[in-house]
């Protein structure tokens, strides 16, 4: 049996959008009830996707501005990014294009990005929305529009609390590394041929 391929997957996004909860939900099937900024240790596990076994390494990052200089250190060697925003936070949605895409393109150009909308369970929760009048739900159409804008191969909405689509997020991250989209290859080949000239 051949050794499984190692895939480094790094979560990125604004503070409090649910990056750590997503990782904890995926790795332990539990949902933390208290918010403690980034207390997820790097995690590695063998995962089987479409019959291929990979060793998935999960790296959490802190979204807060205090970590702007430290955070990019975890980007080195990344195979894929999970770029998360909260489906109930317009600011976190807007920061994908304003802050995170420029940062990732600067420090890790060419690394694929899976766009993820978190807190799906709260988007249609009338009690939550009544208690949080500032919360502006982001629609699936808006998420898809953002995916196209940033050129991400996939957009997935999930809930770490209910576990809806949590596995799908990481399956998509693994698949984009194992089977890169053909469009990106063409772009790279075109770039290579241009740089040769």
UniProtKB/Swiss-Prot annotation:
Question: Residue ranges for motif Effector region?
Answer: 35-43
Per its UniProt record, what InterPro entries does this chain match?
A: P-loop_NTPase, Small_GTP-bd, Small_GTPase, Small_GTPase_Rho
Gene Ontology biological process terms from the UniProt entry: small GTPase-mediated signal transduction
Task: Please report which positions carry a covalently bound lipid of kind S-geranylgeranyl cysteine.
Answer: 194
Location in the cell reads:
Cytoplasm; Membrane
Q: Does the keyword Ion transport apply?
A: no
Q: Which residues make up the pro-peptide? A: 195-197
Query: Where Cysteine methyl ester occurs along the chain?
Result: 194
A single GO cellular-component term on record: membrane
Q: Does the keyword ATP-binding apply?
A: no
Q: Which UniProt keywords apply?
A: Cytoplasm, GTP-binding, Lipoprotein, Membrane, Methylation, Nucleotide-binding, Prenylation
Record membrane topology:
Peripheral membrane protein
Summary of the function given for this chain in its UniProt record: Inactive GDP-bound Rho GTPases reside in the cytosol, are found in a complex with Rho GDP-dissociation inhibitors (Rho GDIs), and are released from the GDI protein in order to translocate to membranes upon activation.
UniProt similarity note: Belongs to the small GTPase superfamily. Rho family.
Q: What is this protein called?
A: Rac-like GTP-binding protein RAC1
- UniProt source species: Lotus japonicus (Lotus corniculatus var. japonicus)
């Amino acid at each position: 049996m051949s050794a499984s391929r190692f895939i480094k997957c790094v979560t990125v996004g604004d503070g409090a959008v649910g990056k750590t909860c997503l990782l904890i939900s995926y790795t332990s099937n539990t949902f933390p009830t208290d918010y403690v900024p980034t207390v997820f240790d790097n995690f590695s596990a063998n995962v089987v996707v479409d019959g291929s076994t990979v060793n998935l390494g999960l790296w959490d990052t802190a979204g807060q501005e205090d970590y702007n200089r430290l955070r990019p250190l975890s980007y080195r060697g990344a195979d894929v990014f999970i770029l998360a925003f909260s489906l109930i936070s317009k600011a976190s949605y807007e920061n994908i294009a304003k802050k995170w895409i420029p940062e990732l393109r600067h420090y890790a150009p060419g690394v694929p990005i899976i766009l993820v909308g978190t807190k799906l369970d709260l988007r249609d929760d009338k009690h939550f929305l009544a208690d949080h009048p500032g919360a502006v739900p982001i629609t699936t159409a808006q998420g898809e529009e953002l995916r196209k804008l940033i050129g991400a191969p996939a957009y997935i909405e999930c809930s770490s609390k209910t576990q809806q689509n949590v596995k799908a997020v990481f399956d998509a991250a693994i698949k984009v590394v194992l089977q890169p989209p053909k469009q990106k290859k063409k772009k790279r080949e075109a770039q290579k041929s241009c740089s040769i000239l």
